Design a protein with these regions (language model features):
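Accessory, non-ATPase domains that flank or precede helicase/AAA+ motor cores in DNA-metabolism machines
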Residues: 1-264, 270, 287-317, 345, ...
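Inter-lobe coupling/hinge segments of SF2-like helicase ATPases
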Residues: 135-155, 159-211, 216-260, 286-572, ...
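Short secondary-structure junctions
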Residues: 373, 431-434, 584-591, 630
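Conserved beta/loop motifs at nucleotide-recognition and modification sites
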Residues: 352, 590, 633
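Intrinsic-disorder-associated, low-complexity terminal segments enriched in Asp/Asn/His/Tyr and depleted
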Residues: 276, 284-286
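Short amphipathic beta-strand starts and helix->beta connectors
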Residues: 542-551, 586-599
Length: 643
């Protein structure tokens, strides 16, 4: 009899010991009984016969984790302080299909690859000679053509490639564009793909018919057996960060894989039998291990500082762009209405943006548009109506609601909410002849709806699109002459040290939707005109100025971690928080910079408390995460969300 520790998939349980009459391969999938229910699990390791009686493994499936998946599983569990079973749940959607040995040859001939400019070729060469690189390329500078060329070289080397994109950018048009160069060897992978279609994609992927996957962050967990390239497009995008446990960032996982792939474990017997490691001779580059390329027109401050980058300036668009500023309060001003009317008269189109996450909980001055900052943290404080106070969610400092602006002495206004539905009604009243549609997650619930709406817009059946951050993604609106951006002051005033970075990147992305084929106009409704005028044409200047402001307290110069405690009993949640805090105080080089009730103190019938930590290396945060894990708390390393 053999004995094994089994990782129970998608459960917070520690590995449990089971017996089996035959020898099993590590990380093969099995069915076991937990309580009186059947559960899936992975063989973790063989152990000696335990002193207690244990259940027998019910059966073994044909599924197993690949070397890349095992690397990811163990790293995610360790780095993000997650139970192995919870981390293993990330791979669970791919367990339904059998693992088919990858023995077929990929049929692409790459005869229609795009021709690169001299600068694009330099960027390609730079990227393929570094394990990890960043292409910092202006909108329209030709990043996509570089991606396609890098993918082609990887596939020619007999390897697999993964193109990660924000989910909303993964349109049928994107698939057709990739298939233009790589025939049918492309699989699109995101949450709106039907289960049956996913199973067909997996079958073709595992047989080798598909070697290129274009997908959202979950595609990183597919069973790659010979991955050679990961491209992370729009690497700054928050959608790469998982909001629930384990709180991983797919971009950071892609970077880690590239840096550690050459140190990977010995492949399993099944992987070796597939003979996937054959690499043709006469290649331009060393394709051992995994290479990761990040790309963005507005890269994150952290990536710019830490990753070798190639600056790809210029644009292939033969167009010009004019920026206009509207100082009116949030809403449709006469200026905006008149410009929209002119666009419609010229048979052109417009897009109007409203922020999704403008939580409208920040006090803004009506006269100068500035918000109220914490005197100890240099971040904006949030409005708490019930307490009639402003509060910092970093350190817990609070102050009574002011009666005047600390900057100019003017009156203080509470932000008022305007959503896409209200905005659409206002537009229909002001422009009754216009054909107006909403473009947000409430409206776009399926891939088919997205495809239909984009087609209708590009066919001229819609005059004005009113949307949220979905509008900012890389859709090609060829007849858009005007982009209107509302609500950025609320976005800029978020209680987040990244508020300026996120807001400017968003403004530049939305502005990029206008004037792609001709002259375009961008109207930004803001009281912070000076900020936008300083940086809209030079994001790199903003990054350099922002780095000076952040040193030494914020990333990339320091590391942050947020521990979230939630419990149905508020007293129990508060007590667990105090117990964790007491243990954290013994960790050297760890700073507790804030704790208390979370800004959203009650979600899903559970009370929420937080602890915010800072360190200048990962080790203290890892120790803190292990303490939190023992109490069942969630640790968010490198947090994006402070609610």
């Amino acid at each position: 009899m053999f004995y094994y520790e089994i990782i129970i998939t998608a459960h917070a349980l520690a590995p449990l010991t089971y017996s089996c009459k035959r020898e099993l391969e590590p990380f093969s999938e099995v069915l076991v009984e937990v309580g009186n229910k059947q559960k899936k699990g992975y063989v973790y390791k063989q152990v000696d016969k335990p002193s207690f009686k244990c259940k027998e493994i019910l059966s073994q499936t044909d599924f197993y984790l690949t070397a890349t998946q095992i690397q990811l599983l163990e790293f995610i569990s360790s780095y993000y302080s997650s139970e192995l079973g919870v981390a293993a749940g990330l791979f669970e959607p791919f367990c339904e299909s059998k693992n088919i040995l990858d023995t077929s040859e990929f049929g692409g001939d790459f005869s229609t690859l795009p021709e690169l400019s001299e600068l694009q070729n330099k960027a390609l060469d730079f990227s393929l000679k570094n394990d990890v690189s960043l292409i910092f390329g202006d909108t329209g500078s030709g990043k996509s053509e570089i991606y396609i060329s890098a993918i082609a070289k990887t596939l020619k080397a007999g390897k697999q490639a993964l193109l990660l994109m924000p989910e909303i950018a993964l349109t049928p048009q994107m698939q057709k564009r990739l298939e233009k160069y790589f025939s049918q060897g492309v699989g699109l992978w995101h949450s709106k793909i039907a289960k049956g279609k996913k199973e067909r994609i997996l079958k073709d992927f595992m047989s080798g018919k598909i070697r290129l996957i274009a997908g959202a962050r979950s595609a990183l967990f597919l069973p790659f057996t010979n991955l050679g390239l990961i491209i992370v497009d729009e690497e700054h995008d928050e959608s790469y960060k998982n909001a629930s446990k384990p709180c991983y960032n797919a971009r950071d996982l892609a970077i880690w894989l590239a840096k550690n792939s050459k140190k990977s474990r010995i492949p399993s017997k099944k992987e070796l039998s597939a003979e996937n490691s054959r690499i043709p001779s006469g290649l331009d580059y060393d394709f051992e291990g995994i290479r990761t390329i990040l790309g963005s027109a507005t890269p994150s401050v952290v990536s710019y500082h830490k990753i070798p980058h190639f600056r790809l300036k210029g644009t292939f668009f033969t167009s010009s762009k004019e920026f206009l500023f509207d100082h009116s309060p949030l809403g449709l001003s006469n200026m905006i209405i008149s410009h929209l009317a002119a666009v419609l008269e010229a048979k052109k189109q417009a897009v109007i943006f409203l922020p999704t996450r403008g939580n409208f909980k920040v006090l803004l001055c009506k006269d100068c548009g500035k918000s109220f900052s914490c005197p100890f943290c240099a971040v904006n404080m949030s409005l708490h109506k019930n307490a009639n106070a402003l509060k910092c969610h970093y350190c817990g400092f609070s102050s009574p609601l002011p009666s005047s602006c600390e900057h100019c002495g003017g009156s203080v206004l509470q932000s008022q909410k305007i959503g896409t539905s209200e905005l659409k009604l206002m537009l229909e009243s002001a422009l009754p002849k216009a054909k107006i549609a909403k473009f947000d997650r409430d409206e776009i619930t399926t891939a088919k709806k997205l495809e239909t709406l984009l087609k209708d817009f590009n066919d001229g059946k819609i005059d004005i699109l009113v949307g949220t951050q979905m509008l900012s993604k890389g859709h090609d609106y060829h007849n858009v002459e005007l982009a209107v951006i509302l609500g950025l002051d609320e976005h800029l005033a978020h209680a987040d040290f990244r508020a300026s970075e996120k807001t400017l990147a968003l403004a530049m992305q939305i502005a990029g939707r206008a004037g792609r084929a001709s002259h375009g106009k961008v109207i930004i409704q803001t009281a912070q005109q000076e900020f936008f005028e300083s940086y809209l044409s030079d994001f790199e200047l903003f990054i350099k100025d922002e780095l000076e402001l952040r040193e030494p307290l914020y990333p990339p110069f320091a590391r942050l971690s947020r521990i979230l405690i939630s419990h149905a009993n508020e007293q129990k949640a508060a007590r667990i928080t105090e117990q964790i805090l007491a243990q954290l105080k013994s960790i050297e080089n760890l700073e507790i910079i804030g704790h208390g009730k979370a800004s959203i103190a009650y979600i899903a019938s559970k009370f929420r408390y937080y602890i915010l930590l800072r360190a200048h290396s990962h080790s203290p945060l890892l120790k803190a995460g292990n303490i939190a894990l023992a109490y069942g708390a969630t640790t968010d390393i490198d947090p994006f969300n402070f609610n």
